[in-house]
Amino acid sequence: MMYLSTAINVLYKEGLTPCYKIKDSTDPDKWGKVPTKSDDTWNAVTCDWKANGYRLPTDAEWEWAARGGENYKYAGSDDIDDVAWYAKYEYEYDKGTREVKRKKPNGYVLYDMSGNVWEWCWDWWRENIPSDTPAAGVPSGSLRSLRGGSWCNYDNICSVDSRGIKAPSEGGNITGFRVVRSCD
């Protein structure tokens, strides 16, 4: 909870409003212990889309950012070696994450949106997303959407349109996150 409390304090210091609530509170000290497995209370977290604090991107926001205003297969290039850390061969599964900004950025100067680590998105997973889905994504589920692929995936999994899934309680060395803020 120390990290969450520190993050919330930074938000307040910057004059920002926290986006997430658990048990109708933005105070992490009132959220309870971070669960090690699926937990109904933590799975019921809500997001205040009008708040100006940091949050996970939606699936659609992530893809828009990854595309960088361009139409490449990967975030910044059609050649994956320009922009991503990934598994070219089976024996590369043990390479691990890499330092950011060692590859070319995309058109919005965002680095490592293809490969390196899967990035959590706010959305609950749904195989096919209907066109009338709200901007905030699918409202409920048991698995969250991941984007970008990781260092242990082959190139086809690291494209900007590829999606993965994971339970919110799962971690590991192939997942990370990128935060966004809504702008007025």
Predicted segments with their positions:
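Active-site phosphate/pyrophosphate-handling residues
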Residues: 60-63, 84, 178
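Short, well-ordered turn and helix-capping elements at secondary-structure junctions
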Residues: 87, 102-104, 162-165
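Surface-exposed recognition segments
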Residues: 70-71, 78, 93-96, 113-184
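Short aromatic-cysteine micro-motif
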Residues: 1-70, 90-111, 183
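Conserved beta-strand positions that form and line the central face of beta-propeller blades
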Residues: 73, 82-85, 99-102, 145
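Short acidic, gly/pro-rich beta-turn/loop elements at beta-sheet edges
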Residues: 84, 110, 156
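Structured loop/turn residues at beta-strand edges in well-structured enzyme cores
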Residues: 52, 78-81
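Glycine-rich, acidic and aromatic/proline-enriched surface loops and short helix-turn segments
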Residues: 3-10, 67-68, 79, 85-89, ...
